[in-house]
Amino acid sequence: MSAVAEPQPSVALHPDIAALAPLLGTWRGAGHGQYPTIESFDYHEEISFGHLGRPFLTYRQRTRAADGSRPMHAETGYLRRPRPDHVELILAHPTGITEICEGSLTIADGELRMDFDSTHIGRSSTAKLVTALGRSFRVAGDTIEYSLRMAAVGEPLTHHLAATLRRD
């Protein structure tokens, strides 16, 4: 079986998530990260949104160092739309973090926007202390821009990542 985040063109998109169709596919691009406790860095990223014909999208994210020398981060999960203007992002990180975020969905002027705040952060006994996350996505045509805010290791909710990706 292929990775669940890959688009499933032979299966009809569930009507509850039809508004999220602009996200479908694989997106690649570059980003920049910063945080008060680390040196700033650049990275390459790939995000894939797919579907299984159910009322959610699958989500798979991978990043590598800008020079391609090493993997940096990964996330896997699901994007749900339980109400027309409300979205939920449920993610697992290999660092021992799980993340449930909820937020708003706005579609206007040819753009899809999602703004999330974490409602629950779970962590294993060995994971770093992350207490809050926030994400914003903007999709216009074949471009997706996102930013991520994080409260971790004693720092308040602070800008951490931003990237611009293009659909393959």
Curated annotation (Swiss-Prot):
Domain of life: Bacteria
Enzyme class: isomerase
Pathway annotation from the record: Nitrogen metabolism
Renumbered ranges of motif GXWXGXG: 25-31
A Pfam family matched in the record: THAP4_heme-bd
Signal peptide stretch: none
Family recorded in the similarity comment: Belongs to the nitrobindin family.
Domain observations: Forms a 10-stranded antiparallel beta-barrel structure able to accommodate a hydrophobic ligand in its interior. In fact, this fold hosts the heme group, which is located in a wide surface cleft.
PANTHER family linked: PEROXYNITRITE ISOMERASE THAP4, THAP4 PROTEIN
UniProt function note: Heme-binding protein able to scavenge peroxynitrite and to protect free L-tyrosine against peroxynitrite-mediated nitration, by acting as a peroxynitrite isomerase that converts peroxynitrite to nitrate. Therefore, this protein likely plays a role in peroxynitrite sensing and in the detoxification of reactive nitrogen and oxygen species (RNS and ROS, respectively). Is able to bind nitric oxide (NO) in vitro, but may act as a sensor of peroxynitrite levels in vivo.
HAMAP family per record: nitrobindin
Name recorded for this polypeptide: Peroxynitrite isomerase
Organism the protein comes from: Nocardia farcinica (strain IFM 10152)
Phylogenetic classification of the source organism: Bacteria, Bacillati, Actinomycetota, Actinomycetes, Mycobacteriales
